[in-house]
Regions:
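Active-site beta-loop-alpha junctions enriched in small/polar residues
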Residues: 9-13, 35-39, 66-70, 107-109, ...
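Acidic (Asp/Glu)-rich catalytic clusters
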Residues: 21-28, 42-62, 88-98, 129-136, ...
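N-terminal pre-domain/capping segments
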Residues: 1-89, 275-277
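Active-site acidic/histidine proton-transfer and metal-coordination neighborhood
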Residues: 72-172
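Charged helix-capping and loop-helix junction motifs
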Residues: 45-51, 80-87, 118-123, 155-159, ...
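Acidic/histidine-rich catalytic cores of soluble enzymes
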Residues: 129-222
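Hydrophobic faces of well-ordered beta-strands that scaffold small-molecule active sites
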Residues: 4-10, 32-34, 61-65, 102-104, ...
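C-terminal helical cap(s) of enzyme catalytic domains, especially alpha/beta-barrels
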Residues: 258-274
Length: 277
């Protein structure tokens, strides 16, 4: 079984960054994903301080890009240029603070066939590559599996994109996948099948990147994240499935409350594993 790094989505509130990361470490967390979903709250001046605090606490960072920063636009107009700029800026900040992955959403069908949408995403990621390489900040990106059954961003879509773009990895959101499968993620075999498909496209040594929480859904579409135990998604089969792979994993809780994040971590054994490694 590969090492599991586990932690919350979002930094805890604290007077200083050092205290925030110390609080994460005290709870046994060794990963954290913070977001620019509603705006860029971090600047280049503060990013090195964040990197130092995370490193001192042995917390691996990932970043969630703004929601509007998706690829696969129907044309290269204003919205595409804005998204490209936001992903570029996110990459600069991620590099400055030592984040290991930037998570982004895959976009929308916008009336196109799925194959054409995938082709547009891959093509526009080529534009992003050129821009980031020119600035020396081509960091790993992760494209997230989405939570609405008829929309773009199924696990199949994500795997095809990641297989064609070498700096992009799949991000498995098991809450989303549980919703779109009408609650099928109940046993280790189902989790392991998704992990095996992802393992086949990840480069050697790269960890699985996973989002996890309990989930409410209707008509195979996500409606909201739930406190752990209120829905039907459980961490035990994820733990057992991960044990079948040598590849390490980063698991981020997107639970709406701290107690749920702690409960999921206890099942995964993330806290005890971190202290014995």
């Amino acid at each position: 079984m590969g090492e599991i790094r586990y932690g919350p989505s979002g930094l805890p509130e604290a007077p200083t960054l050092e205290e925030a990361f110390a609080a994460l470490a005290a709870d046994g967390y060794r990963a954290c994903e913070f977001g620019f979903v509603s705006g860029f709250w971090l600047d280049y001046e503060a990013a090195p301080q964040l990197a130092e605090a995370a490193d001192a606490a042995d917390v691996a960072l990932s970043v969630h890009a703004p929601l509007a920063a998706f690829m696969g636009h129907a044309d290269r107009g204003k919205k595409f240029k804005m998204a490209l700029g936001m992903l570029d800026h996110t990459a600069g900040l991620a590099q400055a603070c030592g984040a290991r992955l930037i998570v982004f959403h895959p976009g929308f069908l916008l009336g196109r066939e799925r194959e054409q949408t995938i082709a547009d995403v891959v093509d526009q990621l080529g534009d992003l590559r050129e821009r980031l390489e020119a600035k020396g900040r081509l960091v790993p990106f992760g494209v997230e599996v989405m939570g609405r059954v008829r929309d773009f961003g199924t696990i199949e879509d994500v795997l095809v994109i990641a297989a064609q773009v070498d700096f992009v990895r799949p991000v498995l959101d098991f809450a989303h996948m549980h919703a779109t499968s009408d609650g099928a993620f109940l046993d280790a075999d189902t989790f392991a099948a998704a992990l095996a498909a992802t393992d086949a496209v990840l480069e050697p040594g790269a960890p699985f990147h996973i989002h996890f929480s309990d989930i409410q859904y209707a008509n195979r579409n996500e409606t909201k994240h739930l406190p752990y135990g209120e829905g039907t998604l459980r961490a035990e089969p994820l733990r057992d499935a991960l044990a079948r792979f040598e590849r390490p994993a980063t698991v981020i809780s997107e639970s709406p409350d701290a107690a749920s994040t702690q409960a999921i971590g206890a099942v995964l054994g993330a806290s005890s594993a971190s202290r014995s490694s």
